[in-house]
Each structure stands twice: as structure tokens, then as C-alpha cells.
Amino acid sequence: MQDFVHLHVHTQYSLLDGQASVSRLVDKAMKDGMKGIAVTDHGNMFGIKEFTNYVNKKNSGPKGEIKDLKKRIAGIESGEIECEDKEAEIADCRAKMAEAESKLFKPIVGCEMYVARRTMDKKEGKPDQSGYHLIVLAKNEKGYHNLIKLVSHAWTRGYYMRPRTDRSELEKYHEGLIVCSACIGGEVPKKIINDQLEEAEEAVRWYKNLFGDDYYLELQRHKATVPRANHEAYPLQQKANAKLLELARKYDIKVICSNDVHFVDEENAEAHDRLICLSTGKDLDDPTRMLYTKQEWMKTKAEMNALFEDVPEALSNTLEILDKVEYYSIDHAPIMPTFAIPEDFGTEEGYRQKYTEKDLFDEFTQDENGKVVLDEDAANAKIKRLGGYDKLYRIKLEADYLAKLAFDGAKKLYGDPLSDEVKERLVFELYIMKTMGFPGYFLIVQDFINAARTQLGVSVGPGRGSAAGSAVAYCLGITKIDPIQYDLLFERFLNPDRISLPDIDVDFDDDGRGEVLRWVTEKYGQEKVAHIITYGTMATKMAIKDVARVQKLPLSESDRLCKLVPDKIPDKKLNLPNAIAYVPELQAAEASPDPLVRDTMKYAKMLEGNVRGTGVHACGTIICRDDITDWVPVSTADDKETGEKMLVTQYEGSVIEDTGLIKMDFLGLKTLSIIKEAVANVRLHRGLELDIDKISISDPATYKLYCDGRTIGTFQFESAGMQKYLRELQPSTFEDLIA
């Protein structure tokens, strides 16, 4: 039997078209002994980060073994580890390493792209509405970044019904990429089927000239075996396959086979069929609706060998592609945006002349009092983690400017000269910020907060969460709460023992939030600022309703089934299998004599949790040092406020920071808008200019309102439960409220 890997695979991130979860695909491939798979969703890279993360998790065991064996070999070679026969021991370690490496599963990052029939800037009617399919795989890190560019530009420049690229873009970003001719929607197969043989050959020559041995012709065989399926595709595939094999011989191009995977197992075909009904807005019994062949499951190596036993090289060539693909990481250390520091304060070039690498080594590896606290190995590891000496000059410049701003602000707040307590607190916090590599983050946050207050007239909240524990944040104007007065812990906010990016949630009045984001976009550049994508999944009740609708289950019965689903299940996650186990009526529905009810439950279980659509994170925004598409793929979404297109990362918020991008949270708070409006009303009707930040927080009349529970509209004190406790506890000081 020939070895084989799948190179044309759609996950659930091929929205309402793929029905396969990343984890199930990887698990099945590994169980079948495959050495890797590709993920090639339609026009996007939404699932790539989840894919690489899951594979890394699966590979953690063998990677740990390899790391330990390398360490042992180094120890033997240096003499730190003694053994009787060094050569034999090292040979044994290398053999074990080879065995561990053979267990590694390789993730291949890819995308099934749409190539415009003309050029991606043409957007005129039916000829430009779609495009030819093309499988594009990243061979290495360079290829990954080129794929990001292609996919991002397809959204931002080429979108017309679908995200489209074109030949010009492929020429520009072809390095490090492998391409395959795709399904019968691909340019070459489509032209063969349409008897445009000269045009098909022209396309083959063009791709061969550009990609050389990294261009492959792709064979597929989807012979439908059930009545309600697409029986027209297979004859077309066979027509295309015959000519593709002929062209492969003529132009010395290798062929591969694929199965255009859209679901995991054969028994998922009917669930996938219902998903396509949802996607196309058709009922299951509609005779005109779109049908798949129902052969598009992740077939095993044995099943693929049976399909292509007459073309064994099409199977083995998939391993050639796998071997071409390198292991690389798509994660990155934090990529801090560049804050423009006044030149009269200092420049990187000036700092390079002023400070030696030894100066930087001492400053970044000693404590805030100049004491040596790290051994040489740990110190060098820290320098490396911060990006090396080249990066340290920038960090030091930002840290020094941050210190200047912090101490200037401290003198205004605490008076001059500063007390020893304040100085010690600021020196300690600034040291942590500097040696963790984050001074630029605080410069940027204070910049847009001060711009909101002084330039844009936007109300800014006093601070929330752990950032309120930072005296530096207080002195910069990021927060309005004195952490020294209220004995708030800085270590809850930043802790060198827990390396993670700072997280400052900033509240703006909800009318002004958009203005602040526009200011940030203009300052840092439209290509460097993006919102963060979210994925909407089919929840339990939604899955039932969706399947019921396409199957024409009466609405009353659909509603009845949904009402049987509990809001929560004791000690268990709420999902349909757990709900069925918990609710006898749902068990009865699952075994119902009515096939419509029974099938609704059966396929709702399969579709539950499937990604249904995308959205935009309510407050998360990326500000990047570079064009964001240098690091992650972007798509577009409509700005609800302006109707304009805005950039959105294709990786969601829980993983985006792994790639090095810096997330800032811009929250819109209605409470701030209410306060702003109240101040304006006082000015209008009383002629008084109020500064909300200077109103005393010790006003007895205000505490009387709290004690009476009259706090509707007061942020975090307006719920019925809070009002009840306020009446019971009778707070009389600010410390009572924050206890």
C-alpha cells in the first residue's frame, strides 16, 4: 500500500460548507498513520492558528523526547555526562531521536484560493463573480508569509462575491509556495471540461513556468453511491483526469490525488447535506438544490489506495509534498508598535553611541537597585527573549522616556519633591516594565488616552481591573486611582514570573469610542490597525432549529424540542448529548417513531458547535508596528457606525497574541456618556463648569443614595442584588464600596 496524506481539506472554517472540526480531522489522520495533513479552507485562513496549535499539542510528547535527547547528547559530548562508551551512547540517542521524529505529525498551512478569471480589480458582473479554485500550500516560513499576503489582498483588494487573487499577485508572492490544480472548479480542469484545451495548456504552462516542480496536477474521483447525491461530478472528473494525466506526461508535471475533504466520516455525509441546505437557503426536499457526491469524507490511506491503485504515483507524490514542507512556527515574540519619541529627548542612533552592549546587559539583567540577580545563562536567555541587543536599544529609549513622563506626572499628583515611598514604587514598576520589554505599550496607551481627553473631548473611565494597581499608569493619566493610597497590588497587573502582555481595558463614552479608534488609525496607519474576528457557532438550540427548518419539521415541534433543552446541567457542559442524557423527553425524541423528529436530533448533534459565521470583537483592537499582513491574514467587515470596510484579523482574540500582535481593548461605556450628558446639562441650565474628576468622593448626600439602594444607572452598582446589599451594609466611605 502506498503512503498518503490529504492535501485538500476543508474544516468548519469553510463557513457553512465544511463540517469537520480541526481536532477530529487531525485525530483521524493520526490514528490512520498519516504523517500530516493540509488545511485548505475556501478563501480564508480562519482555522490555521487552531490547526497549528492542536498539532503542536499532539506533538508535545515526541518534541519533549527530542529535546531531552539533544540535551543528553550535548552533555555526553561536553563531558558533563559520563558513560563507558560515548560513541555507542550517542548513537543510541540519535536512533531514539529518529524514532521520536518519525512520530511527529506535520501541519501543512494552506488555502483553496479563488483566482480571478480576469484580474482581481475587475468587478463587473457574472464573469468576475467567482474565480478558478487553486490549492496553495506554504512550504516554509517565507511561503507562509506570502500566503498571508495573497489571502489578505484577496479580501482587501480583490473581493467580489468572494475573496479573489490573480496571476499578477501569484507572480509577486510565489516564493515558498506549492500549488495544486484543485478540483473541477480549478482553471485547468474547468477548461478541459469545457473543451478549451488550448487554454488549459496555456494555464498549465503558466503555472509550470512560475512554480516549477512545486506545481502539481490534482486528480479526484467522487463516484456517488447513494441516490440523493451529485452523480454528475464523477464523469466530469474522469474527463478532466484523463487529460490531466496526458498533460502531466507532456510537461513533466507530477500528479497527486485528493478527496476534497468536507467532513470527517462517511456517516457525516447527511449532516453535511443539511449544512449545505442552510448555506444555500434551500429545503432538504428541494429538487433543484445543490448536492455534493457524499464521497467527501476524510478517507483512510486504504480507501485512497483503492481509489487510485491504477495511479500509485498520485498517492506517493503527496508524501513528496509533505517532505518539501518544513517545520516552522507561526508564533512570535511581542511585536511592539513604534511610539514616536521626540528627537530632542533621544534617538536609537544616539543611544547606540552612548551605551555599550555591556551597559545594556547590566541594566537589563540586574534588579532595580543594580544588584546581580541572574546567572550568566539566565541573563543571556533574558536578553535573547527581549529580542537581542538590537531590540534593547529601542526598549531602553522607550523606558527612559516613559520614566520621564511618569516622574513628571508624579510631581503634579504627589508634589515635588516626591516621597521615598512614591519614588521606590515608580522605580520598581518602571524596572519591571522595562525588563519585560513593554515600555512602548504604556507610551501608546497614555498617548491615545490623553488625546481622547484633551483633543477629542471624549470621556475616559478612571480605570478598571488590575491596571488600577499601577502607580506608573496613575502618573501617566491612564488611570485616575491612586494605588498607593488604596494599597493596590502592582503584581496583579504585571508579574515577571508570569510572562504575559499587559492588559489594560480602557473605557470611553460610547459615543466617543469610534472617534478614538479613528484617531489611532490615522496616527499609526490604516494598514497597521485592525479589529479582531469572532466566530459564531451553532449552539444547542440553534442546531435543532436549523436542522428542523431544512427538514420542514413543524415549527411547533421544533419549538417544543428547543424548550426541552435546559439552561444548564449540573456538573456538565451544556451540549446536546448531555442534554439528551439529562432530559427523558429528549431521549424519547431521539428514538421517536417520526423520522423527521429522529433525524432532527441525530443531525443537530452532528452540527452542534459548527462555525456558522463571523463577527467582530466588541472592543479588541490590534495596533501593529508593521503592516498587519506582514504577520497575520486579515479579512474585512462592515463598520456598523460608518458603513465603511474595516480590517479584521483572521485569527481570533484568544490566540492572536501568540503571533506577537499587541491587543488593546477600547470599550464603549454608556455610563460615561450619561455622566458627560449630565455635566453638559448642568452647564446649559445652571451655567456651571463641572470637572467630574474633581468632585469629592466623600459627599454624604451621595452615600445616602447608596445606603438607600438608589443606584440605577451607576456602573456595577445597579443590579437588584447590589442594591439589596447596599441597603444592608450601609456604606459611608469609598473604602466601604471597594472592600
Predicted regions mapped to residue ranges:
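Alpha-helical scaffold/interaction cores of sigma-54-like transcription cofactors
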Residues: 1-739
